C-alpha cells in the first residue's frame, strides 16, 4: 500500500463545517436556539470557567463562544483569546484592591469566627449529589418563581461595602510575614514568553488563565503526598471587584466597572530560623475571573509549592515552575494534542521506510552469520 502526501479539498472542509452547524441545530421542529442570556445566567459556572481560561472578562462573549463551540470549554476559551488578540491595547490597568470586593460568598476553614462573619452564599458544598428529576420538565412559570421567592425571603439588612481580610489579622499577630509592596510592574504573559526562572507574578498570571482540570490535577498530586504544603484556607472570597482606572483629565481613580472574581488565600506549614527572625506561616494565593472555587484553591496551593521550589529547589513536580507553568494552559495543550489530527503523511512514510530498512537488515543478519568464512 502506498502512502502519498495529499491536499485537503476546500469543499470537504466546508462540508465538515456545515455538518457541525447542522448538529448544533438538530433538535427538531420544536427546537429553539439557546439565547446568550440563558447561557450566561443558567450556566453561570460554565461561563465563569471560559472567562477565566480565556483570560478576558466578557461574560456575554464567553456565552457566545460556548454556544458556537457547542459546550467545548477548551475551544470556547480559545475563541475568547483569539477575540482578545484583535482588540487594541488601551492602557495598563493599575493594581486593583480586592479587599474592596462586594462579596456574595466568604468562608474560612481556619477560624470559626472571622471579622465580619462567615457568609456561605451560593454553594453546593453541603448539598446531596442526587439528581433533581423535577428539573427535567421545569415549566417557565416555576422557573421564574424561584428567584422571586428567594428575593422576597431575603431580609433588608445594612451590609458593609467590604469586609476585612483574615490574613490581615494573622499579620497583625505576627503569624504571617509583613506584606512587602514591590514597585516593579507585573510580568505580562500576553507579550513576553516565559523564560525560566520567572518572577512570581508570571507564575500567578499563567495559573490565573490555566485550564481548571490541569491545575487541579497537579495541585492534587501535592495534596496526596508528592509535596508538603498541607494548606488551610484562611479565606475564600467570591464577589465583584470594582475596577478603578485613572480619570483621563484629573488622573484621579474612578470606578469604570466591576468584575466577578474568586480569591483564595491559604496558610501552610510555618518556616523560619534564627537568621530570618521568628517562624511564621507561609501564604499561597489564588485568584481568577468568575466563580471558580476549585481553581482558586488549586492555584493557591501551587503558588505556595512553587515558592518553595523556587527557594529550595523542586523536590517534586508540583514545585517545579517549568513543569507546572508549561503544562497547565488548556489552549496550548489542546492545540498540541489536536495537531496530531492533521496530515502527517510524509513523516509517517519516512517512519515506515526506516522500519522496513531495519527489518531488512535484521532478516539478512542471520544469513550473513551462518555463511562459511
UniProtKB/Swiss-Prot annotation:
InterPro entries listed in its UniProt record: PhnI
Pfam family of the protein (one): PhnI
Position of the signal peptide: none
Entry's Gene Ontology BP terms: organic phosphonate metabolic process
Family note: Belongs to the PhnI family.
Described purpose of this protein according to its UniProt entry: Belongs to an operon involved in hypophosphite oxidation. Exact function not known.
Protein name: Putative C-P lyase subunit protein HtxH
Amino acid at each position: 500500500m502506498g502512502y502519498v502526501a495529499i491536499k485537503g479539498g476546500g469543499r470537504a472542509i466546508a462540508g465538515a463545517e456545515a455538518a457541525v452547524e447542522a448538529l448544533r441545530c438538530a433538535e427538531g421542529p420544536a427546537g429553539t436556539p439557546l439565547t446568550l442570556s440563558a447561557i450566561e445566567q443558567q450556566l453561570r459556572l460554565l461561563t465563569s470557567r471560559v472567562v477565566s481560561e480565556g483570560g478576558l472578562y466578557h461574560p456575554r462573549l464567553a456565552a457566545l463562544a460556548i454556544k458556537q463551540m457547542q459546550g467545548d470549554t477548551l475551544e470556547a476559551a480559545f475563541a475568547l483569546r483569539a477575540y482578545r488578540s484583535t482588540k487594541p491595547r488601551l492602557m495598563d490597568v493599575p493594581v486593583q484592591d480586592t479587599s474592596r470586593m462586594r462579596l456574595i460568598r466568604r468562608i474560612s476553614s481556619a477560624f470559626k469566627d472571622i471579622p465580619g462573619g462567615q457568609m456561605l452564599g451560593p454553594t453546593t458544598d453541603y448539598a446531596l449529589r442526587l439528581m433533581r428529576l423535577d428539573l427535567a420538565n421545569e415549566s417557565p412559570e416555576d422557573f421564574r418563581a424561584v428567584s422571586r421567592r428567594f428575593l422576597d425571603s431575603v431580609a433588608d439588612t445594612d451590609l458593609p461595602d467590604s469586609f476585612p481580610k483574615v490574613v490581615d489579622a494573622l499579620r497583625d499577630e505576627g503569624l504571617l510575614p509583613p506584606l512587602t509592596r514591590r514597585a516593579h510592574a507585573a510580568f505580562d504573559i500576553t507579550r513576553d514568553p516565559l523564560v525560566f526562572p520567572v518572577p512570581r507574578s508570571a507564575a500567578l498570571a499563567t495559573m490565573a488563565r490555566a485550564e481548571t482540570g490541569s491545575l487541579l490535577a497537579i495541585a492534587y498530586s501535592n495534596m496526596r503526598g508528592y509535596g508538603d504544603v498541607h494548606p488551610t484556607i484562611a479565606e475564600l472570597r467570591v464577589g465583584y471587584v470594582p475596577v478603578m482606572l485613572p480619570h483621563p483629565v484629573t488622573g484621579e481613580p474612578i470606578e469604570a466597572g466591576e468584575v466577578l472574581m474568586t480569591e483564595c488565600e491559604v496558610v501552610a506549614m510555618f518556616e523560619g530560623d534564627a537568621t530570618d527572625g521568628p517562624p511564621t506561616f507561609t501564604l499561597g494565593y489564588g485568584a481568577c475571573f468568575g466563580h471558580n472555587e476549585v481553581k482558586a484553591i488549586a492555584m493557591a496551593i501551587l503558588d505556595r509549592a512553587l515558592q518553595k521550589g523556587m527557594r529550595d529547589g523542586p523536590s517534586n513536580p508540583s514545585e517545579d515552575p517549568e513543569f507546572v507553568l508549561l503544562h497547565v494552559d488548556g489552549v496550548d495543550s489542546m492545540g498540541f494534542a489536536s495537531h496530531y489530527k492533521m496530515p502527517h503523511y510524509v513523516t509517517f512514510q519516512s517512519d515506515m521506510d526506516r522500519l522496513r530498512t531495519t527489518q531488512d537488515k535484521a532478516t539478512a543478519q542471520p544469513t550473513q552469520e551462518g555463511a562459511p568464512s
